[in-house]
Amino acid sequence: MIVFSALVPSSPFLFPSIGQSATDKLKATLQAYQELSAHLYAAQPDIIVVVSSYKTVEASTFFINQSPHYTGHVKEFGDLEFSFRRKGAIGFAHHWKESLARTSPVQLHTKQDLHPTISIPAEILTKPLPRVKIIPVEVADVSSDLHYQFGKEKNNAFASAQQRVAVCVLGTLSQKLSPDSPAGFSLAAKTYDTFMMSH
């Protein structure tokens, strides 16, 4: 059954040792994270599915990570002490993949080392739950219809599961607000940001 769901921003600056200079700007976000962490703890999930737009491979396939263990470091940001460690849920990941195989482009892979954009939010949210198992998922470069289908089938699989499942989607606001943006400019960017912040 699904016992918790959240859409949260993902940034290395959320971690105190990295984002010290931005702490004031991130105060509301960090407070919201702590509130979500408390709600997540109260839900007592067995498994947390972490859906991220970060990709280890550019592909038109959803990747479900079924590593037995996960680790995460932020050495590239100057913090040599931080170490994220959680167990995976291999059986659940495999069963979930099989239930999706006929309707969605999905594959299993095994990646133990997690990118900071995944490990840092996961660390903040699951700090009170050090024994909880996680399943990272990489979204695919596919149509919105296929994303909807994947989400619908995911919901059906989790709702009928005996395990208590939490779903955390990691995302960002638009990076196309300015003509000077490396990602380019989009007239829809502001509308997208407004919609996301209001929900």
Model-derived features with residue positions:
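Soluble secreted/lumenal catalytic domains
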Residues: 1-166, 170-199
